[in-house]
C-alpha cells in the first residue's frame, strides 16, 4: 500500500509526461532565442517623469531572488529587481544594480539545521522536489554595504523592516539574511538602510509573509498571522518614511493569491489509491474498513445519545473504497471528542482499550475536495508514524498532522486576512498616488488571475507562442519550492511592473525576454552537483 500511495503522489507532483519528454537537465527545453532587434527603427526609451538613477528594492524573498527553497546565485542574478533594473538602465537607471551576493551555487534550504542541504531540484530518481546535498552556510556579505540596491530579505514580515532586532541573533525578529548585510547589525534597520541610500525610485513588495507563514504552517501558528491593525500601523510607517524622507517615486505591490501557488495545489486531496484489480489492495481496503468499524460505531453511539448530529457523523466517518480516496487529516477546527469518548467508556459502551484506540481520531476526518494538502505532505503521506509499526500509515490509518493541510475554515480565514491586508496596502498607497503606482496582483483581469485560472480560463498563460504553466515543471513559472517564481516567472512580474511604470510615469521602457531565461531543470543521478548545476551554466 505504501508504494502505491507514494507512486501516485509522485505522478501528481512531477508529471509523468514531463519525465517521458525530458531525458537530461536541459535548462531551456523550449529552445527559445532572443528576438531580433530592429536596427533601422530603434526605440527611444525615456524615464518620463520618473528618475531611475538610484533604484532600490524593498521586500522579502520575492525581492531577494529566493528560489528553489534557497537564496543562491542564480536566483539573485535573475531576481525581479535585477531584471527590472536591467530594463530601467535603458532610461537613465544606474549602470550597476548591487545585490548582497551570497556567492553560492546551492544556497541553504535548512538554516535551522546547519545548512547541510542546498536548493531544491527535480530529480527523476526521487519523488517530488528534493534538496541538493551541498548546502552552504549563510555568511556575512563581503561587499560594500553602503552601495546596495536590493534590500530584499527572505522570510520577513512588514514589522521586521522597522526593528533592529532583525539583525540581532537570538532576538524574536532575528533574520540571518538581514544580519549578513546590515549596515550596523543590532542597531540598524532594513528601512533605515534603505533611506540612507536616498533612492530616486523604489519597489516595495511586503506583506506576503504576514499571511503566508500561517498558511504554510497549516494554520497552526497564530503568532505569525499579523493582525490587521498592527499591519496598518507598521505599513503606514514604512511608506510614510519613504515618502517623507526621500523624494522617491515608486511601486507598491499587494499580496497575490498565494493559495493558488503549487505549494498548495500540487498534491491532490485524494492520492490514496487502491487498485480494484489488485487482490492485495482490495484486501487492504477490507482490513482498513474493519479496523475503522469501531470508530464509526463510536460516532454512531454519540449520535444516538444526542452528542453528535448526523452531519457530524457523516463528516468524520472513515470508509475506504477502490480507486482514489481522500487523505485522513487532523482538523483542529473540529470539536475534540475526547470527553465524549470518555462518556462512552464511563457507561461501559466501550472498553478502556477501545477508548485508548480512539484517541488519535478525536479531531480526525477525511479531507474534502477543495481543501488543501500542502507540498511537504507529499513526502509524508503513506509513511509510517512509527517505523516499528507497519499499520501506522500517515494519512491512511492515522491522520496526517494538521500542519500539512488546510481545512475550509482555515482557507476562509487566510483569504479574509489577505483581503484585509491588501485593502490596507491599497489604501496607504492611494494616500500618495501622485508618487506611488499601485500594482494590484489581484486584478480579476490581470496576469495572476490568468495564470491561476481565477478568471475562469484554464490555468497557465501563453507567452511568445509557448504555454507556461502555474507549476514547477520545466514548462512552469514557479521554482521547485512551489512558492517563489523561477527566472521566467520573475521576468513576467518584472514586465508587469514595467507596464505599470510606463502607464503611471509616462515612461518608455524595454521588456525582459521571458523565454530567454532558464526554467526548472530535471536532474538525474540523485542530485549530483554536475547534473543540477546545468541550469546555471551558460547564463
Features from the language model and the residues they span:
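Bacterial Sec-dependent N-terminal signal peptides
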Residues: 2, 19-51, 507-524
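Bacterial N-terminal signal peptides that target proteins for export
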Residues: 2-13
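Catalytic nucleophile-elbow at a beta strand-turn-alpha helix junction centered on a G-D-S/GDSL motif
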Residues: 53-69
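Active-site-proximal beta-strand/loop segments in catalytic clefts of secreted hydrolases
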Residues: 58-61, 204-209, 215-217, 253-257, ...
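Conserved SGNH/GDSL esterase-like catalytic core that processes O-acyl groups on lipids
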Residues: 71-237, 259, 264, 348, ...
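Histidine-centered active-site loop/cap adjacent to the catalytic His
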Residues: 84, 466-520
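A structural motif corresponding to the C-terminal end of an alpha-helix
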Residues: 196-197, 234-252, 417-440
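Mobile gating loops/cap/lid regions near enzyme active sites that modulate substrate access
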Residues: 265-416, 426-483
Amino acid at each position: 500500500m505504501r508504494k502505491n500511495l507514494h507512486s501516485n503522489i509522485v505522478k501528481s507532483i512531477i508529471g509523468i509526461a514531463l519525465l517521458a519528454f525530458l531525458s537530461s537537465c536541459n535548462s531551456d527545453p523550449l529552445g527559445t532565442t532572443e528576438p531580433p532587434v530592429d536596427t533601422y527603427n530603434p526605440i527611444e526609451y525615456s524615464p518620463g517623469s520618473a528618475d531611475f538613477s538610484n533604484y532600490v528594492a524593498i521586500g522579502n524573498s520575492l525581492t531577494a531572488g529566493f528560489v528553489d527553497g534557497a537564496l543562491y546565485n542564480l536566483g539573485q542574478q535573475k531576481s525581479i529587481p535585477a531584471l527590472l533594473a536591467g530594463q530601467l538602465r535603458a532610461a537613465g537607471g544606474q549602470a550597476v544594480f548591487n545585490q548582497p551576493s551570497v556567492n553560492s551555487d546551492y544556497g541553504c534550504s535548512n538554516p535551522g539545521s546547519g545548512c547541510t542541504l542546498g536548493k531544491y531540484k527535480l530529480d527523476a530518481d526521487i519523488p517530488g522536489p528534493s534538496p541538493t546535498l551541498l548546502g552552504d552556510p549563510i555568511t556575512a556579505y563581503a561587499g560594500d554595504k553602503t552601495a546596495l540596491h536590493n534590500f530584499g530579505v527572505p522570510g520577513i514580515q512588514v514589522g521586521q523592516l522597522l526593528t533592529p532586532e532583525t539583525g540581532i541573533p537570538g532576538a524574536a525578529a532575528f533574520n540571518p539574511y538581514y544580519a549578513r548585510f546590515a549596515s550596523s547589525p543590532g542597531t540598524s534597520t532594513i528601512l533605515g538602510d534603505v533611506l540612507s541610500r536616498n533612492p530616486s525610485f523604489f519597489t516595495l513588495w511586503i506583506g506576503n509573509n504576514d499571511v503566508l507563514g500561517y498558511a504554510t504552517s497549516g494554520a497552526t501558528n497564530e503568532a505569525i498571522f499579523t493582525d490587521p491593525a498592527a499591519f496598518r500601523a507598521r505599513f503606514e510607517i514604512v511608506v510614510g518614511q519613504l515618502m517623507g524622507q526621500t523624494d522617491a517615486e515608486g511601486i507598491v505591490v499587494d499580496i497575490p493569491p498565494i493559495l493558488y501557488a503549487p505549494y498548495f495545489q500540487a498534491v491532490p486531496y485524494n492520492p490514496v489509491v487502491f487498485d480494484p484489480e489488485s487482490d492485495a489492495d482490495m484486501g487492504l481496503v477490507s482490513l482498513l474498513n474493519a479496523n475503522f468499524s469501531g470508530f464509526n460505531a463510536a460516532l454512531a453511539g454519540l449520535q444516538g445519545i444526542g452528542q453528535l448530529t448526523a452531519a457530524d457523523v457523516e463528516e468524520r466517518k472513515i470508509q475506504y473504497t477502490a480507486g482514489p480516496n481522500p487523505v485522513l487529516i487532523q482538523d483542529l477546527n473540529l470539536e475534540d471528542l475526547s470527553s465524549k469518548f470518555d462518556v462512552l467508556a464511563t457507561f461501559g459502551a466501550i472498553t478502556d482499550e477501545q477508548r485508548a484506540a480512539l484517541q488519535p481520531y478525536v479531531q480526525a476526518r477525511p479531507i474534502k475536495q477543495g481543501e488543501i494538502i500542502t507540498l511537504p505532505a507529499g513526502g509524508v503521506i503513506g509513511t509510517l508514524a512509527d517505523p516499528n509499526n507497519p499499520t501506522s500509515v500517515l494519512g491512511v490509518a492515522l491522520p496526517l498532522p494538521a500542519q500539512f493541510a488546510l481545512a475550509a475554515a482555515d482557507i476562509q480565514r487566510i483569504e479574509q486576512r489577505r483581503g484585509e491586508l491588501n485593502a490596507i496596502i491599497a489604501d496607504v498607497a492611494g494616500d500618495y498616488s501622485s508618487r506611488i503606482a499601485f500594482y494590484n496582483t489581484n486584478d480579476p483581469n490581470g496576469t495572476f488571475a490568468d495564470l491561476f485560472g481565477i478568471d475562469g480560463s484554464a490555468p497557465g498563460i501563453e507567452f511568445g507562442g509557448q504555454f507556461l504553466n502555474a507549476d514547477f515543471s520545466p514548462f512552469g513559472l514557479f521554482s521547485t519550492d512551489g512558492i517563489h517564481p523561477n527566472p521566467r516567472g520573475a521576468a513576467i512580474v518584472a514586465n508587469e511592473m514595467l507596464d505599470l511604470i510606463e502607464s503611471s510615469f509616462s515612461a518608455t521602457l524595454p521588456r525582459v525576454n521571458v523565454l530567454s531565461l532558464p526554467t526548472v531543470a530535471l536532474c538525474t543521478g540523485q542530485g549530483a552537483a554536475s547534473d543540477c548545476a546545468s541550469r546555471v551554466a551558460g547564463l
